[in-house]
Design a protein with these regions (language model features):
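Active-site region of glycoside hydrolase catalytic domains
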Residues: 1-57, 100-102, 111-474
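Active-site mouth loops of central-metabolism enzymes
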Residues: 58-72, 149-152
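Internal amphipathic alpha-helical repeat/solenoid segments
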Residues: 65-78, 99, 110
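Catalytic domains of carbohydrate-active enzymes, especially glycoside hydrolases
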Residues: 72-93, 301-306
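A short acidic, glycine/proline-enriched capping/turn motif at secondary-structure boundaries
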Residues: 86, 95-97, 135-137
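Glycine-rich, proline-tolerant flexible connector loops at the mouths of alpha/beta enzymes
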Residues: 92-106
Length: 474
Protein backbone atom coordinates (compact mmCIF):
# COMPACT_ATOMS: atom_id res chain seq x y z
CA UNK A 1 0.00 0.00 0.00
CA UNK A 2 1.32 3.44 -0.94
CA UNK A 3 2.36 5.87 1.79
CA UNK A 4 1.00 8.68 -0.39
CA UNK A 5 -2.59 9.56 0.54
CA UNK A 6 -5.56 9.03 -1.74
CA UNK A 7 -6.09 12.15 -3.84
CA UNK A 8 -2.41 13.12 -3.69
CA UNK A 9 -1.75 15.70 -6.41
CA UNK A 10 0.95 14.38 -8.73
CA UNK A 11 2.01 16.64 -11.57
CA UNK A 12 4.52 19.06 -12.97
CA UNK A 13 5.30 22.76 -13.16
CA UNK A 14 6.09 25.44 -15.72
CA UNK A 15 6.19 29.24 -15.53
CA UNK A 16 4.79 31.76 -18.00
CA UNK A 17 8.06 33.65 -18.39
CA UNK A 18 10.09 30.49 -19.09
CA UNK A 19 7.71 28.69 -21.41
CA UNK A 20 5.06 30.88 -23.04
CA UNK A 21 7.11 33.08 -25.36
CA UNK A 22 4.85 35.29 -27.53
CA UNK A 23 6.20 38.19 -25.49
CA UNK A 24 4.44 40.83 -27.61
CA UNK A 25 1.31 38.90 -28.67
CA UNK A 26 -2.22 39.10 -27.33
CA UNK A 27 -1.76 42.59 -25.94
CA UNK A 28 0.97 41.56 -23.50
CA UNK A 29 3.26 44.26 -22.12
CA UNK A 30 6.97 43.97 -21.39
CA UNK A 31 8.05 42.45 -18.08
CA UNK A 32 11.29 42.39 -16.12
CA UNK A 33 12.26 38.98 -17.47
CA UNK A 34 11.88 40.24 -21.04
CA UNK A 35 14.80 42.60 -20.33
CA UNK A 36 17.18 39.93 -19.00
CA UNK A 37 19.58 38.81 -21.76
CA UNK A 38 21.43 35.57 -22.24
CA UNK A 39 25.18 35.92 -21.81
CA UNK A 40 27.71 37.95 -19.86
CA UNK A 41 25.38 40.76 -18.72
CA UNK A 42 22.67 38.44 -17.42
CA UNK A 43 23.75 38.28 -13.79
CA UNK A 44 24.38 42.02 -13.40
CA UNK A 45 20.88 42.75 -14.73
CA UNK A 46 19.29 40.11 -12.46
CA UNK A 47 21.05 41.57 -9.43
CA UNK A 48 19.71 45.04 -10.18
CA UNK A 49 23.21 46.42 -10.69
CA UNK A 50 22.85 47.18 -14.41
CA UNK A 51 19.81 49.09 -15.66
CA UNK A 52 18.02 47.54 -18.60
CA UNK A 53 14.97 49.61 -19.49
CA UNK A 54 15.33 49.17 -23.26
CA UNK A 55 15.79 46.06 -25.41
CA UNK A 56 19.01 45.85 -27.43
CA UNK A 57 19.29 44.56 -30.97
CA UNK A 58 22.67 42.93 -30.30
CA UNK A 59 21.47 40.66 -27.49
CA UNK A 60 19.40 37.47 -27.28
CA UNK A 61 16.50 37.34 -24.84
CA UNK A 62 15.47 33.72 -24.13
CA UNK A 63 12.03 34.58 -22.74
CA UNK A 64 10.80 36.24 -25.93
CA UNK A 65 10.04 32.94 -27.65
CA UNK A 66 10.90 30.46 -24.88
CA UNK A 67 9.30 27.09 -25.76
CA UNK A 68 6.17 28.59 -27.35
CA UNK A 69 3.68 27.24 -24.80
CA UNK A 70 1.46 30.18 -25.82
CA UNK A 71 0.75 28.50 -29.16
CA UNK A 72 1.38 24.87 -28.13
CA UNK A 73 -0.40 24.62 -24.78
CA UNK A 74 -2.94 22.09 -26.05
CA UNK A 75 -0.16 19.76 -27.20
CA UNK A 76 1.73 20.22 -23.94
CA UNK A 77 -1.30 19.68 -21.70
CA UNK A 78 -2.18 16.55 -23.70
CA UNK A 79 1.32 15.22 -22.91
CA UNK A 80 0.73 15.96 -19.22
CA UNK A 81 -2.59 14.14 -19.39
CA UNK A 82 -0.87 11.17 -21.03
CA UNK A 83 1.43 10.96 -18.00
CA UNK A 84 -1.63 11.05 -15.75
CA UNK A 85 -1.10 14.46 -14.14
CA UNK A 86 -3.55 15.34 -11.38
CA UNK A 87 -2.24 18.92 -11.13
CA UNK A 88 -0.40 21.35 -13.40
CA UNK A 89 1.37 24.28 -11.83
CA UNK A 90 1.77 27.31 -14.06
CA UNK A 91 1.71 31.08 -13.71
CA UNK A 92 -0.21 34.00 -15.13
CA UNK A 93 1.89 36.73 -16.72
CA UNK A 94 0.70 39.87 -14.92
CA UNK A 95 1.37 41.91 -18.09
CA UNK A 96 -0.94 39.72 -20.20
CA UNK A 97 -3.85 40.90 -18.04
CA UNK A 98 -2.55 44.39 -17.26
CA UNK A 99 0.09 45.26 -19.91
CA UNK A 100 1.32 48.32 -18.00
CA UNK A 101 0.42 46.94 -14.58
CA UNK A 102 -1.49 50.02 -13.42
CA UNK A 103 -4.57 49.93 -15.69
CA UNK A 104 -8.06 49.92 -14.22
CA UNK A 105 -9.52 47.35 -16.61
CA UNK A 106 -7.82 44.14 -17.76
CA UNK A 107 -6.85 43.03 -21.25
CA UNK A 108 -9.59 40.62 -22.31
CA UNK A 109 -7.26 38.79 -24.73
CA UNK A 110 -5.10 37.79 -21.78
CA UNK A 111 -8.07 36.57 -19.76
CA UNK A 112 -9.32 34.57 -22.75
CA UNK A 113 -5.93 32.90 -23.20
CA UNK A 114 -5.64 31.72 -19.61
CA UNK A 115 -9.28 30.68 -19.48
CA UNK A 116 -8.59 28.46 -22.48
CA UNK A 117 -5.48 27.01 -20.80
CA UNK A 118 -7.37 26.20 -17.59
CA UNK A 119 -10.34 24.78 -19.48
CA UNK A 120 -7.94 22.52 -21.37
CA UNK A 121 -6.57 21.29 -18.03
CA UNK A 122 -10.04 20.62 -16.64
CA UNK A 123 -10.96 18.69 -19.80
CA UNK A 124 -8.40 16.09 -18.72
CA UNK A 125 -9.25 16.24 -15.01
CA UNK A 126 -6.09 18.23 -14.21
CA UNK A 127 -6.29 20.83 -11.43
CA UNK A 128 -4.46 24.08 -12.22
CA UNK A 129 -2.18 25.41 -9.47
CA UNK A 130 -1.55 29.02 -10.43
CA UNK A 131 1.13 31.49 -9.36
CA UNK A 132 0.15 35.15 -9.64
CA UNK A 133 3.67 36.55 -9.93
CA UNK A 134 6.53 34.33 -11.07
CA UNK A 135 9.52 36.66 -11.59
CA UNK A 136 7.73 38.90 -14.12
CA UNK A 137 6.80 42.40 -12.92
CA UNK A 138 5.42 44.66 -15.69
CA UNK A 139 8.28 46.91 -16.81
CA UNK A 140 6.09 50.02 -16.69
CA UNK A 141 5.85 49.53 -12.92
CA UNK A 142 9.65 49.45 -12.73
CA UNK A 143 10.31 52.54 -14.83
CA UNK A 144 7.42 54.68 -13.55
CA UNK A 145 7.11 53.61 -9.92
CA UNK A 146 10.38 51.95 -8.91
CA UNK A 147 8.64 48.58 -8.71
CA UNK A 148 8.06 47.08 -5.26
CA UNK A 149 9.91 49.84 -3.44
CA UNK A 150 6.71 51.83 -4.13
CA UNK A 151 3.62 51.26 -1.97
CA UNK A 152 1.39 51.82 -5.03
CA UNK A 153 2.22 48.29 -6.21
CA UNK A 154 0.17 46.86 -3.35
CA UNK A 155 -2.90 48.50 -4.92
CA UNK A 156 -2.00 47.38 -8.45
CA UNK A 157 -1.29 43.80 -7.39
CA UNK A 158 -4.52 43.60 -5.38
CA UNK A 159 -6.52 44.69 -8.42
CA UNK A 160 -4.72 42.13 -10.57
CA UNK A 161 -5.26 39.37 -7.99
CA UNK A 162 -8.98 40.10 -7.68
CA UNK A 163 -9.29 40.07 -11.46
CA UNK A 164 -7.72 36.60 -11.57
CA UNK A 165 -9.81 35.18 -8.73
CA UNK A 166 -13.04 36.44 -10.31
CA UNK A 167 -12.19 35.67 -13.95
CA UNK A 168 -11.09 32.09 -13.23
CA UNK A 169 -13.49 31.25 -10.42
CA UNK A 170 -14.63 27.66 -10.86
CA UNK A 171 -11.55 26.81 -12.93
CA UNK A 172 -8.76 27.45 -10.41
CA UNK A 173 -8.92 26.83 -6.67
CA UNK A 174 -5.22 26.44 -5.82
CA UNK A 175 -3.26 29.70 -5.89
CA UNK A 176 0.24 30.93 -4.99
CA UNK A 177 0.94 34.64 -4.59
CA UNK A 178 4.68 35.14 -5.26
CA UNK A 179 7.07 32.53 -6.58
CA UNK A 180 10.12 31.91 -4.35
CA UNK A 181 9.50 35.18 -2.55
CA UNK A 182 12.82 35.01 -0.69
CA UNK A 183 14.79 35.15 -3.96
CA UNK A 184 14.30 38.92 -4.03
CA UNK A 185 17.10 39.13 -1.44
CA UNK A 186 19.47 37.25 -3.74
CA UNK A 187 18.35 38.35 -7.21
CA UNK A 188 16.50 41.65 -6.67
CA UNK A 189 15.61 42.57 -10.26
CA UNK A 190 14.38 39.05 -11.03
CA UNK A 191 12.50 38.71 -7.78
CA UNK A 192 11.04 42.19 -7.37
CA UNK A 193 12.03 44.44 -10.28
CA UNK A 194 14.48 46.36 -8.09
CA UNK A 195 17.27 48.47 -9.60
CA UNK A 196 19.63 50.15 -7.17
CA UNK A 197 21.02 53.66 -7.18
CA UNK A 198 24.69 54.07 -6.38
CA UNK A 199 25.33 54.44 -2.66
CA UNK A 200 21.86 53.55 -1.37
CA UNK A 201 21.30 50.97 1.38
CA UNK A 202 20.32 47.93 -0.68
CA UNK A 203 19.10 46.03 2.39
CA UNK A 204 16.71 48.88 3.20
CA UNK A 205 15.33 48.85 -0.35
CA UNK A 206 14.95 45.06 -0.40
CA UNK A 207 13.21 44.74 2.95
CA UNK A 208 10.87 47.67 2.27
CA UNK A 209 9.97 46.02 -1.04
CA UNK A 210 9.55 42.74 0.84
CA UNK A 211 7.11 44.41 3.22
CA UNK A 212 5.05 45.64 0.29
CA UNK A 213 5.00 42.15 -1.24
CA UNK A 214 4.02 40.60 2.08
CA UNK A 215 1.14 43.05 2.51
CA UNK A 216 0.07 42.46 -1.11
CA UNK A 217 0.21 38.70 -0.57
CA UNK A 218 -1.92 38.92 2.58
CA UNK A 219 -4.46 41.14 0.80
CA UNK A 220 -4.59 38.71 -2.12
CA UNK A 221 -5.20 35.85 0.32
CA UNK A 222 -8.05 37.81 1.92
CA UNK A 223 -9.56 38.64 -1.49
CA UNK A 224 -9.31 35.02 -2.66
CA UNK A 225 -11.28 33.81 0.35
CA UNK A 226 -13.89 36.57 -0.15
CA UNK A 227 -14.38 35.67 -3.82
CA UNK A 228 -14.70 31.97 -3.04
CA UNK A 229 -14.24 30.42 0.41
CA UNK A 230 -13.14 27.20 -1.33
CA UNK A 231 -10.04 28.90 -2.73
CA UNK A 232 -6.78 27.73 -1.18
CA UNK A 233 -3.85 30.14 -1.21
CA UNK A 234 -0.25 29.27 -0.52
CA UNK A 235 3.04 31.09 -0.12
CA UNK A 236 6.12 29.82 -1.97
CA UNK A 237 9.69 29.52 -0.65
CA UNK A 238 12.92 28.72 -2.43
CA UNK A 239 13.57 25.95 0.07
CA UNK A 240 16.52 23.90 1.20
CA UNK A 241 17.77 24.08 4.76
CA UNK A 242 21.28 25.12 5.74
CA UNK A 243 23.60 22.65 7.41
CA UNK A 244 26.38 23.93 9.68
CA UNK A 245 29.66 23.32 7.87
CA UNK A 246 31.01 21.86 11.11
CA UNK A 247 29.90 21.36 14.70
CA UNK A 248 31.75 24.55 15.63
CA UNK A 249 29.13 26.65 17.49
CA UNK A 250 29.79 29.65 15.27
CA UNK A 251 28.98 27.53 12.20
CA UNK A 252 25.76 26.29 13.82
CA UNK A 253 24.74 29.88 14.47
CA UNK A 254 25.64 30.90 10.90
CA UNK A 255 23.37 28.14 9.56
CA UNK A 256 20.52 29.27 11.80
CA UNK A 257 20.91 32.85 10.58
CA UNK A 258 20.89 31.78 6.93
CA UNK A 259 17.75 29.70 7.49
CA UNK A 260 16.08 32.67 9.15
CA UNK A 261 17.03 34.92 6.23
CA UNK A 262 15.02 32.67 3.91
CA UNK A 263 12.23 31.71 6.30
CA UNK A 264 11.55 35.32 7.34
CA UNK A 265 9.08 35.69 4.47
CA UNK A 266 7.18 32.50 5.27
CA UNK A 267 7.21 33.34 8.99
CA UNK A 268 5.13 36.40 8.11
CA UNK A 269 2.91 34.71 5.50
CA UNK A 270 2.16 31.61 7.59
CA UNK A 271 2.12 33.12 11.09
CA UNK A 272 0.71 36.56 10.32
CA UNK A 273 3.28 38.71 12.08
CA UNK A 274 6.91 39.74 11.86
CA UNK A 275 9.15 37.26 13.73
CA UNK A 276 10.86 38.47 16.91
CA UNK A 277 14.35 38.04 15.44
CA UNK A 278 13.62 40.47 12.59
CA UNK A 279 13.93 43.53 14.85
CA UNK A 280 17.62 42.86 15.50
CA UNK A 281 18.30 41.91 11.87
CA UNK A 282 16.78 45.19 10.68
CA UNK A 283 18.62 47.22 13.31
CA UNK A 284 21.99 45.74 12.35
CA UNK A 285 21.34 46.28 8.63
CA UNK A 286 20.16 49.87 9.07
CA UNK A 287 16.62 48.98 8.01
CA UNK A 288 13.49 50.75 9.21
CA UNK A 289 10.29 49.42 7.69
CA UNK A 290 7.80 52.10 6.70
CA UNK A 291 4.42 50.58 7.51
CA UNK A 292 1.06 52.06 6.64
CA UNK A 293 -1.71 52.11 9.26
CA UNK A 294 -3.47 48.76 9.24
CA UNK A 295 -0.59 46.76 7.74
CA UNK A 296 -0.14 44.61 10.83
CA UNK A 297 -3.83 43.73 10.74
CA UNK A 298 -3.66 42.89 7.01
CA UNK A 299 -0.72 40.54 7.60
CA UNK A 300 -2.93 38.39 9.83
CA UNK A 301 -4.53 36.99 6.65
CA UNK A 302 -2.31 33.93 6.64
CA UNK A 303 -1.96 31.37 3.87
CA UNK A 304 -3.76 28.03 3.80
CA UNK A 305 -0.67 26.00 2.93
CA UNK A 306 3.08 26.39 2.55
CA UNK A 307 4.58 25.54 -0.82
CA UNK A 308 8.26 25.40 -1.63
CA UNK A 309 10.90 24.40 -4.13
CA UNK A 310 13.64 21.96 -3.24
CA UNK A 311 16.64 21.21 -5.39
CA UNK A 312 19.45 20.94 -2.85
CA UNK A 313 20.41 21.55 0.74
CA UNK A 314 22.95 24.23 1.64
CA UNK A 315 25.91 24.72 3.96
CA UNK A 316 26.90 27.75 6.02
CA UNK A 317 29.95 28.68 8.06
CA UNK A 318 30.99 31.67 10.11
CA UNK A 319 33.83 31.98 7.60
CA UNK A 320 32.28 31.69 4.13
CA UNK A 321 35.07 30.73 1.71
CA UNK A 322 34.33 32.00 -1.79
CA UNK A 323 36.64 29.34 -3.24
CA UNK A 324 34.42 26.64 -1.77
CA UNK A 325 31.07 28.11 -2.76
CA UNK A 326 28.05 26.96 -4.70
CA UNK A 327 24.89 28.80 -5.74
CA UNK A 328 22.13 26.22 -5.84
CA UNK A 329 19.00 28.05 -7.01
CA UNK A 330 20.75 31.46 -6.69
CA UNK A 331 21.21 31.14 -2.90
CA UNK A 332 24.92 31.07 -2.05
CA UNK A 333 26.21 28.10 -0.09
CA UNK A 334 29.41 26.29 0.74
CA UNK A 335 29.95 23.04 -1.13
CA UNK A 336 29.03 19.93 0.82
CA UNK A 337 31.84 17.36 0.40
CA UNK A 338 29.47 14.49 1.23
CA UNK A 339 27.18 15.06 -1.76
CA UNK A 340 27.35 14.25 -5.44
CA UNK A 341 26.59 17.22 -7.68
CA UNK A 342 24.59 17.88 -10.84
CA UNK A 343 26.02 19.07 -14.17
CA UNK A 344 25.61 22.60 -12.82
CA UNK A 345 27.27 21.92 -9.46
CA UNK A 346 24.13 21.67 -7.33
CA UNK A 347 24.38 19.15 -4.50
CA UNK A 348 22.08 16.11 -4.69
CA UNK A 349 20.62 15.47 -1.24
CA UNK A 350 17.30 13.57 -0.98
CA UNK A 351 17.58 13.27 2.81
CA UNK A 352 17.84 17.06 2.88
CA UNK A 353 14.31 17.18 1.48
CA UNK A 354 12.99 15.10 4.38
CA UNK A 355 14.89 17.32 6.82
CA UNK A 356 13.53 20.49 5.17
CA UNK A 357 9.96 19.19 5.25
CA UNK A 358 10.18 18.22 8.90
CA UNK A 359 11.67 21.57 9.83
CA UNK A 360 9.01 23.51 7.93
CA UNK A 361 6.07 21.55 9.32
CA UNK A 362 7.44 21.80 12.86
CA UNK A 363 7.64 25.56 12.35
CA UNK A 364 4.31 26.27 10.60
CA UNK A 365 1.89 23.39 11.28
CA UNK A 366 0.28 23.91 7.89
CA UNK A 367 -0.02 21.48 4.95
CA UNK A 368 3.00 21.50 2.65
CA UNK A 369 3.11 21.35 -1.16
CA UNK A 370 6.37 20.60 -2.98
CA UNK A 371 5.87 22.62 -6.16
CA UNK A 372 9.39 22.48 -7.65
CA UNK A 373 11.91 19.65 -7.63
CA UNK A 374 14.05 18.23 -10.37
CA UNK A 375 17.43 17.73 -11.98
CA UNK A 376 18.83 20.16 -14.52
CA UNK A 377 20.97 18.08 -16.86
CA UNK A 378 22.30 17.88 -20.40
CA UNK A 379 20.23 15.41 -22.41
CA UNK A 380 21.53 13.63 -25.50
CA UNK A 381 19.75 11.52 -28.10
CA UNK A 382 20.91 7.91 -28.37
CA UNK A 383 21.56 6.35 -31.78
CA UNK A 384 18.02 4.94 -31.79
CA UNK A 385 16.51 8.41 -31.30
CA UNK A 386 15.66 7.93 -27.63
CA UNK A 387 16.69 10.00 -24.61
CA UNK A 388 17.65 7.63 -21.82
CA UNK A 389 17.70 10.01 -18.87
CA UNK A 390 18.28 7.44 -16.14
CA UNK A 391 20.12 10.12 -14.09
CA UNK A 392 16.88 12.11 -13.89
CA UNK A 393 14.87 9.04 -12.93
CA UNK A 394 17.38 8.25 -10.19
CA UNK A 395 17.23 11.81 -8.80
CA UNK A 396 13.43 11.91 -8.78
CA UNK A 397 13.09 8.38 -7.40
CA UNK A 398 15.22 9.17 -4.36
CA UNK A 399 13.44 12.47 -3.71
CA UNK A 400 10.02 10.82 -3.97
CA UNK A 401 11.21 8.22 -1.47
CA UNK A 402 12.30 11.05 0.84
CA UNK A 403 8.85 12.63 0.48
CA UNK A 404 7.32 9.30 1.43
CA UNK A 405 9.48 9.15 4.55
CA UNK A 406 8.37 12.67 5.48
CA UNK A 407 4.74 11.65 5.07
CA UNK A 408 5.44 8.66 7.32
CA UNK A 409 6.92 11.17 9.79
CA UNK A 410 3.42 12.65 10.02
CA UNK A 411 3.72 15.55 7.59
CA UNK A 412 0.63 16.42 5.51
CA UNK A 413 1.85 16.85 1.93
CA UNK A 414 -0.76 17.97 -0.59
CA UNK A 415 1.12 17.18 -3.77
CA UNK A 416 4.25 17.19 -5.87
CA UNK A 417 4.95 19.08 -9.10
CA UNK A 418 8.30 18.39 -10.71
CA UNK A 419 9.98 21.45 -12.14
CA UNK A 420 10.11 21.99 -15.90
CA UNK A 421 8.00 18.93 -16.70
CA UNK A 422 8.41 19.98 -20.32
CA UNK A 423 11.83 21.51 -21.05
CA UNK A 424 11.92 25.27 -20.53
CA UNK A 425 14.33 28.19 -20.35
CA UNK A 426 16.42 28.17 -17.16
CA UNK A 427 15.60 31.18 -14.97
CA UNK A 428 19.09 31.27 -13.48
CA UNK A 429 21.22 30.88 -16.61
CA UNK A 430 18.87 31.50 -19.53
CA UNK A 431 19.95 28.20 -21.05
CA UNK A 432 17.84 25.57 -22.79
CA UNK A 433 20.62 23.01 -22.40
CA UNK A 434 19.88 22.88 -18.66
CA UNK A 435 16.94 20.54 -19.08
CA UNK A 436 14.49 19.34 -16.43
CA UNK A 437 11.66 17.85 -18.42
CA UNK A 438 10.08 14.51 -19.14
CA UNK A 439 9.60 15.97 -22.62
CA UNK A 440 12.51 17.23 -24.74
CA UNK A 441 11.96 20.50 -26.62
CA UNK A 442 14.10 20.99 -29.73
CA UNK A 443 15.61 24.38 -28.98
CA UNK A 444 19.19 25.34 -28.16
CA UNK A 445 20.77 28.08 -26.06
CA UNK A 446 20.87 30.45 -29.05
CA UNK A 447 17.17 30.01 -29.80
CA UNK A 448 17.56 27.64 -32.74
CA UNK A 449 15.40 24.55 -33.25
CA UNK A 450 12.04 23.25 -34.39
CA UNK A 451 10.41 23.24 -30.92
CA UNK A 452 9.35 19.62 -31.59
CA UNK A 453 8.39 17.73 -28.42
CA UNK A 454 9.95 14.28 -27.76
CA UNK A 455 9.13 12.00 -24.82
CA UNK A 456 12.14 10.96 -22.74
CA UNK A 457 12.55 7.66 -20.87
CA UNK A 458 11.54 9.50 -17.68
CA UNK A 459 8.15 10.29 -19.27
CA UNK A 460 7.15 6.63 -19.13
CA UNK A 461 8.68 6.18 -15.69
CA UNK A 462 6.75 9.10 -14.17
CA UNK A 463 3.53 7.88 -15.78
CA UNK A 464 4.02 4.59 -13.88
CA UNK A 465 4.77 6.45 -10.64
CA UNK A 466 1.55 8.43 -10.87
CA UNK A 467 -0.57 5.39 -11.84
CA UNK A 468 0.69 3.56 -8.75
CA UNK A 469 0.31 6.62 -6.47
CA UNK A 470 4.03 6.61 -5.80
CA UNK A 471 4.33 2.91 -5.05
CA UNK A 472 6.12 1.77 -8.22
CA UNK A 473 9.39 3.70 -8.39
CA UNK A 474 11.47 1.20 -10.35
Amino acid sequence: MSVFPEGFLWGGALAANQSEGAFREGGKGLTTVDMIPHGEHRMAVKLGLEKRFQLRDDEFYPSHEATDFYHRYKEDIALMAEMGFKVFRTSIAWSRLFPQGDEITPNQQGIAFYRSVFEECKKYGIEPLVTLCHFDVPMHLVTEYGSWRNRKLVEFFSRYARTCFEAFDGLVKYWLTFNEINIMLHSPFSGAGLVFEEGENQDLVKYQAAHHQLVASALATKIAHEVNPQNQVGCMLAGGNFYPYSCKPEDVWAALEKDRENLFFIDVQARGTYPAYSARVFREKGVTINKAPGDDEILKNTVDFVSFSYYASRCASAEMNANNSSAANVVKSLRNPYLQVSDWGWGIDPLGLRITMNMMYDRYQKPLFLVENGLGAKDEFAANGEINDDYRISYLREHIRAMGEAIADGIPLMGYTTWGCIDLVSASTGEMSKRYGFVFVDRDDAGNGTLTRTRKKSFWWYKKVIASNGEDLE
